[in-house]
């Protein structure tokens, strides 16, 4: 039944920029070689389960508008299986390699920890079968530690250690399932790992517990032999007012505090970056500089709204800047572009799921083409290198040399009567270079 939901749609193929086929790629040519690598291997696209197959089209003002067959009635074993079948069939029709899930996205509803584990185990068995049937792979798995009322005050940072333990059970099973299914990464998004009021919150206790939880996850990864990457997904707020994983730089400081900076990387979401007051490319550049760039959740926010709207990306210009940072970082190792995006509430047809993903995929592919052209042209990177060339000279090396003191550097400035010559940052010229490609 569920796979038939997409029976009227053919597999999406590349037809080139001049195609007028709404169900074809204009820029995503998966076998095109760019900078020595196939486009599919550069981008590693994934479809998410939660927005695409679990969200009913509801919002805080109204009920769901979608009539997906697997959303009719309770989320029992039958509907959960139908949802899984539809999801993997859809990923195959898009001709992208990966999908992503939370545990609760793929399983029947359950009461109690025993029933929860049993229901999830049944789902994992089925997913393993479906991956083989459809030739798709898992980019990453995760556990939903924010949706159930037990997590109203968080999981790892909850005042109640019993909730911490419940969360540990979910993460153990989700991590082991990710390992079994050949997942490339495991993600931790702390949607409620934060607080709403300082009046009832002990920040010190919560951060220690958060660090302990993450350390336990890393330890379990090694115990079971999982070779993928553990990822944290930064977000400044929503649903809590203050979240501890505010942005990439905050996460890195947290990882350093608990000695995990070589064990954990970040999964950066575009909309979360803008909520934190940064641009998407800033967060990618920061992760690159800190050596913790792992994976990307592709979406966009609304410039007029201060919340996480999770729209499909549609700005080639903005994503070209992001792709420059990804290329400079050496590209993905285990990560990829997961579409953490949803069609709008009025987009109720099955075709809309294709339009949203096709548009996002083509936007990112087009941005890759433009970013590669900028890299191959070399002017922008040459200017950046020239701007910082002084740090490769005698004084720059002296400043960083072991044993050099603040007084030593100050004495050089005085002895040489330094009078630095100002040089233009040429920002407008740089912006013009971007617009030429």
UniProtKB/Swiss-Prot annotation:
It is found in: Cytoplasm. Its cofactor is Mg(2+). The keyword Plastid does not apply. Mg(2+) 1 binds at residues 233, 269, 297, 340. Its main location: cytoplasm. It comes from the Bacteria. Mg(2+) 2 binds at residues 269, 272, 308, 310. It catalyses: alpha-D-xylose = alpha-D-xylulofuranose. SUPFAM superfamilies: Xylose isomerase-like. It is an enzyme of class 5 (isomerase). Gene3D superfamilies: Divalent-metal-dependent TIM barrel enzymes. The keyword Cytoplasm applies. PANTHER family: PTHR48408, XYLOSE ISOMERASE. Homotetramer. This is Xylose isomerase. It comes from Novosphingobium aromaticivorans (strain ATCC 700278 / DSM 12444 / CCUG 56034 / CIP 105152 / NBRC 16084 / F199).
């Amino acid at each position: 039944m569920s796979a038939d939901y997409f029976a009227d749609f053919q597999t999406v193929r590349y037809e080139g920029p001049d195609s007028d086929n709404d169900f074809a790629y204009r820029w995503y040519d998966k076998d095109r070689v760019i900078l020595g690598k196939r486009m599919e291997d550069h981008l590693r696209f994934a479809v998410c389960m939660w927005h695409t197959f679990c969200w009913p089209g509801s919002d805080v003002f109204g009920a769901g508008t979608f009539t997906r067959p697997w959303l009719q009635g309770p989320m029992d074993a039958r509907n959960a299986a139908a949802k899984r079948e539809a999801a993997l069939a859809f990923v195959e029709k898009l001709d992208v390699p990966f999908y992503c899930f939370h545990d609760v996205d793929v399983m029947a509803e359950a009461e109690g920890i025993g029933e929860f584990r049993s229901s999830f185990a049944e789902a994992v068995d089925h997913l393993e079968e479906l991956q083989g049937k459809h030739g798709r792979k898992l980019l990453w798995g995760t556990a939903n530690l924010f949706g159930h009322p037990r997590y109203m005050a968080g999981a790892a940072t909850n005042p109640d250690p019993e909730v911490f333990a419940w969360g540990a059970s979910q993460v153990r099973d989700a991590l082991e399932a990710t390992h079994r299914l050949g997942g490339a990464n495991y993600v931790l998004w702390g949607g409620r790992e934060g607080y709403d009021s300082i009046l009832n919150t002990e920040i010190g206790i919560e951060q220690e517990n958060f660090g302990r939880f993450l350390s336990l996850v890393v330890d379990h990864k090694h115990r079971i032999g999982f070779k993928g990457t553990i990822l944290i997904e930064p977000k400044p707020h929503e649903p809590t007012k203050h979240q501890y994983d505010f942005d990439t730089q905050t996460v890195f400081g947290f990882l350093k505090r608990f000695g995990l900076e070589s064990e954990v990387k970040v999964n950066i979401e575009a909309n979360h970056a803008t909520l934190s007051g940064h641009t998407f490319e800033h967060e990618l550049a920061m992760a690159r500089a800190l050596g913790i760039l792992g994976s990307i959740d592709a979406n966009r926010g609304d410039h007029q709204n201060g919340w996480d709207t999770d729209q499909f990306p549609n700005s080639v210009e903005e994503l070209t800047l992001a792709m420059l940072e990804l290329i400079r970082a050496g590209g993905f190792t285990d990560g990829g572009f997961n579409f953490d995006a949803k069609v709008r509430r009025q987009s109720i047809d099955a075709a809309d799921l294709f339009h949203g993903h096709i548009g996002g995929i083509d936007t990112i592919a087009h941005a890759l083409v433009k970013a590669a052209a900028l890299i191959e042209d070399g002017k922008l990177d040459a200017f950046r290198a020239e701007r910082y060339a002084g740090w490769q000279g005698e004084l720059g090396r002296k400043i960083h040399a072991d044993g050099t003191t603040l007084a030593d550097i100050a004495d050089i400035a005085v002895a040489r009567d330094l009078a630095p010559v100002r040089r233009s940052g040429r920002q407008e010229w740089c912006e013009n270079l971007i617009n030429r490609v």
